[in-house]
Regions:
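Juxtamembrane transmembrane-helix boundary motif
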Residues: 1-9, 30-31, 36, 56-145, ...
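Membrane-helix interface "capping/anchor" motifs
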Residues: 13-21, 160-170, 220-222
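Short helix-coil transition sites and intra-membrane helix breaks within transmembrane domains
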Residues: 13-22, 142-150
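Interfacial segments of multi-pass membrane proteins
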Residues: 24-38, 152-167
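Membrane-interface alpha-helices at helix entry/exit sites of multi-pass transporters
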Residues: 35-42, 65-71, 162-173
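Transmembrane helix-bundle signature of multi-pass membrane transporters/permeases
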Residues: 40-48, 77, 169-177, 206, ...
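Transmembrane alpha-helices of multi-pass small-molecule transport proteins
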Residues: 42-57, 107
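Transmembrane helix-bundle signature of multi-pass secondary active exporters and lipid flippases
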Residues: 179-182
Length: 282
């Protein structure tokens, strides 16, 4: 099953440059049964490998902007470290709340894909210096969920740079690649990567991303990106629902156990009273 998941996700990444973490994390949690931190770490390495394959198609065509890429990385890398640390700290409690937060973050990042580009190029040129600061929360979000570099990075570049769409996509893919490589190292250090599942994803993902890159110029990218963002949004909502359901079940179980313990403690004084009465009779 993981082979098929890897192929489908990689095909979408090759065609549009987005969807890696937004699809992989919900799939690994809902289908693979992985905990949140392991799903994010595994998705990070998988997304990094996919972008490593897709990046040359844009680098060799010089469809990226070095200056804007540098600004994005200056802000995003510190945020990436913070987001990773926060995820690991929350995951130590093994709480369904982590899954709920992941679902909310993934849903929000997918919803951003539906925003339109501002038409004021003068605004974009004058305010591009803010890219580093605006990229910081993208790094935090990516470190926590492995997603967002694609959708959020693209939206940021569309509105704070005057680049043409082809350069936006190329710059964003390289941005996501660097974040994925650094994020993979962070998560690997914390031991939050499932190697067997990762290899299965890669076996299906490598041919998928190659096929997607080969057909990228023949497919209407805009419509496909909207479709992928919509599916990712629904997957994020499903993750929230699954986390809420698990949280309710765990609370109900805890309440039942508490009630059982209270019942046992309630009967203990009666046993002590019987012992005192027996002693008096003797």
């Amino acid at each position: 099953m993981n082979f098929i998941i890897g192929f489908i996700i990689a095909l979408g990444v090759g065609l549009t440059g987005i969807g890696g973490g937004s699809f992989t994390v919900p799939a690994l949690v809902l289908i693979g049964g992985l905990p949140g931190n392991a799903a994010v770490g595994t998705a990070f390495v998988f997304a990094g490998a996919l972008r490593l394959i897709a990046a040359p198609f844009y680098v060799f065509g010089k469809n990226f902007h070095k200056g804007y890429l540098r600004l994005l990385l200056q802000g995003a890398i510190p945020g990436l470290l913070i987001g990773t640390i926060v995820l690991q700290l929350l995951s130590k409690k093994n709480s369904p709340v982590v899954i709920i937060i992941l679902g909310i973050v993934l849903t929000a990042s997918s919803a951003v894909s539906f925003t339109k580009r501002m038409q004021n190029r003068e605004f974009a040129r004058k305010n591009s210096r803010w890219l580093a600061w605006l990229a910081f929360p993208i790094g935090v979000e990516a470190g926590f969920s492995s997603a967002g570099a694609g959708a959020l990075g693209t939206t940021l570049l569309m509105n704070y740079s005057e680049m043409p769409p082809s350069q936006v996509v190329g710059t964003d893919i390289l941005f996501g690649l660097v974040l994925a490589v650094i994020g993979s190292a962070f998560h690997w250090k914390f031991g939050a990567i499932n190697a067997p599942i990762l290899w299965q994803l890669l076996i299906g993902g490598v041919p998928g991303v190659l096929l997607g890159c080969a057909f990228a110029r023949k497919v209407p990218a805009r419509n496909l990106r909207v479709a992928i963002a919509l599916i990712a949004l629904l997957a994020g909502l499903q993750l929230v629902w699954d986390g809420v359901r698990t949280l309710r079940a765990s609370r109900a179980e805890r309440s039942a156990l508490t009630g059982s313990d209270t019942g046992q403690n309630y009967h203990q004084p009666d046993e002590s009273l019987e012992a005192v009465r027996s002693a008096r009779l003797v």
